[in-house]
């Protein structure tokens, strides 16, 4: 009788776990996915957007953070098989562009717009071949700054390189426009982080407004915990994981 009861309980627990239907999510991106600035800013790890999502979806979805700081779509393509396809998730968040758009030498971005588009399409098409549902995300706005006091974007990148392009903020958003276009053309759900951040700063899209919003840290291109909450809310409001 005792053995029968134990067997019954084991079967009950197993059936319950199967019924809950655990699903996997991979968050694939750069430092704003990884939360690379959390350590040196001393932000609470629980307030990274991926971790907020993990907490909210605990018991429903297992979520893997596959963000690596400093990476472009070209870098990410090299690890797409191991970090995404081999994980066999149901959903895939894709957030790149900040490093692709960076101009380091000779006035050229790290990844051209054409190649950036090709890489996004590759991620989407390969995901779908493996039964994975891709979700695109735009990158956050840039606080340009004036290059002084080791603050904001122009303290690390040359403002002159971005002047012909209308400034770093406009240039970065032009990569987001590619993400938006790919989302529309390939019918991929989109979390428009850029749009949500600008709405949260009052719709002004200026350095002053973005600084006052508290959404972006002193680097000028990394989010704060307050910004991470905006990303999470964009996912939840769009019911992205229920589609």
Swiss-Prot record:
Membrane-related topology note: Lipid-anchor
Chief location of this protein within or outside the cell: membrane
Keywords, ordered alphabetically: Cell membrane, Lipoprotein, Membrane, Palmitate, Signal
MF GO annotations: hydrolase activity, acting on ester bonds
Domain of life the protein comes from: Bacteria
Subcellular location: Cell membrane
Lipidation (S-diacylglycerol cysteine): 17
Family matches, as PROSITE patterns: PROKAR_LIPOPROTEIN (PS51257)
Source species: Bacillus subtilis (strain 168)
InterPro entries tied to this protein: GDSL, Iah1-like, SGNH_hydro_sf
Name the record gives this protein: Uncharacterized lipoprotein YqeF
GO cellular component: plasma membrane
Gene name in the database record: yqeF
Membrane-spanning segments: none
Segment forming the signal sequence: 1-16
Residue positions bearing lipid (N-palmitoyl cysteine): 17
């Amino acid at each position: 009788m005792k053995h029968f009861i134990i067997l019954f309980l084991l079967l009950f627990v197993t059936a319950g776990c199967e019924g809950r239907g655990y699903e996997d999510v991979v968050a694939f991106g750069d430092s704003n996915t990884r939360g690379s600035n959390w350590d040196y800013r001393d932000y609470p790890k629980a307030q990274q957007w991926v971790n907020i999502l993990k907490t909210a979806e605990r018991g429903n979805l297992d979520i893997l953070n596959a963000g690596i700081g400093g990476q472009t779509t070209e870098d990410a393509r090299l690890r797409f098989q191991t970090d995404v396809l081999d994980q066999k998730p149901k959903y895939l968040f894709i957030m790149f562009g900040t490093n692709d758009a960076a101009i380091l030498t000779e006035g050229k971005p790290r990844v051209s717009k054409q190649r950036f588009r090709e890489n996004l399409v590759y991620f989407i098409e390969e995901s779908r071949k493996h039964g994975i549902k891709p979700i695109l995300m735009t990158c956050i706005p840039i606080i340009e700054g004036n290059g002084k006091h080791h603050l904001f974007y122009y303290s690390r990148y040359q403002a002159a390189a971005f002047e012909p392009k209308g400034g770093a903020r406009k240039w970065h958003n032009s990569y987001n426009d590619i993400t938006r276009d790919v989302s529309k053309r390939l019918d991929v759900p989109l979390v428009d982080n850029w749009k949500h951040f600008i709405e949260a700063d009052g719709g002004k899209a200026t350095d002053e407004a973005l600084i006052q919003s508290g959404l972006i840290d002193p680097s000028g291109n990394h989010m704060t915990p307050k910004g991470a909450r905006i990303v999470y809310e964009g996912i939840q409001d769009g019911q992205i994981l229920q589609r």
